[in-house]
Amino acid sequence: MNDAVELVWPNKDLSLRASGLTSYEWVQRTDCRLSKPLKVEGACDGLSARSNVLVVGDGLDALEALGATPVLGDGIRLVYIDPPFNTQKTFNQYGDSLARPMWLSMLRDRLDALRPHLREDASVWVHLDDSEVHRARAIMDEVFGESAFVASVVWQKRTSRESRSAFSSNHDTLLVYAPSGPRRWKASRNLLTKDEALLRNRDDDPRGPWADAPFTAPGYRKAQQYDIVTPSGEVLRPPRGRSWYATAKTFEDLLADDRIFFPRNGSGSPRIKLFAHQLRGLVPFTVWGAADVGTNDDAKRHLMELFPDTSVFDTPKPEELLERVIHIATNPHELVVDLFAGSGTTAAAAHKMRRRWVTVERNTQTVLDFTLPRLLKVVRGEDSGGITGQFSWTGGGSLEVLHVAPRFGALTGIHRSSAFMGSAGTLLSTARNEQRATG
């Protein structure tokens, strides 16, 4: 008996390919036009496994083009994508309305194309709101398997209240999948750093400030059931259903090393002192508050500082949010991929954190107005916002730009490969000349 549950939609058996600047076209997977070579402009021959790459084009075409270069050769450690939410609204920089079958195929096809390039310890994070997140989870179950699901992370994207709605929506959801499964991925993911600002030195310990934790452990262990006498003379036993954290011998050693703290003027239950180098990281919660990772408004203010004379995105993501995702899912120099670059937040955060990155944006005007100028500011050390201070970022590194024309439809004006590369080349050469002049 087959117990598989499947989401079905019109034209599911077809492939959805980019056509022209913003359209899509349904094609048979055997369509001979799919074997036609892609038109790629940029320094493909100069790309290496260490390159950071901004690709102008559709995500499917970009992955195919990069597959012929060394860029993806070591595998992708993190995919973070923030696709159009399909809210049926129009925003400053883009329209957000696709027929649902197209939206579903668009997401499915790009996840399918990413899968062969993922490392064994990779994770895929898809950022959505309530418009399509439930259907997206069904698609991700189909592409990666239900057993690959790790978590649904809820991000508090705003702190102001919307009084015109039945409910004031203040969250997005990040669906997290690990193709190797959550148990194996857990072994390689990073914990959150404990806030060392919370450490205190309440007894002037010469080893420095410390935190403390209960000197108890769950469960009954005979060797860890014994009397402890507090400095005030009280005799304590472990609480019901628990044991002391360690054996009596270990407790005596810790006590002699001044690693045991008795609160309430020496009459409280023992607690173990933990210094900064002994602190274990924190397992991430599935709810991320605005105070920890910022809001859309925080990100918007950052963009307005970078582009004071331009109408910026309505719902950009803060670098602090991406910093947490990238910290959990990667280590320095590993590859981060985003197929929906927008203003370039993912690549900007990855660059400041010294990760390699590939970011893809289909809209050439968005790239010229936001993505490329922002990333050049990061490289030149001219972006003081976001996570710059946290990582003491002062500039450095480099990036390459490719233009991948769609196989279907036509591009006109500035959107054509040669015209775009001319404008992008001007931005790049100006930035490099300025770097040489100030270096």
Show the residue positions of the predicted features.
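PRPP-dependent phosphoribosyltransferase catalytic core
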Residues: 358-439
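Phosphate/ATP-binding catalytic cores across multiple sugar-kinase/actin-like superfamilies
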Residues: 66, 110-111, 254-283, 287-293, ...
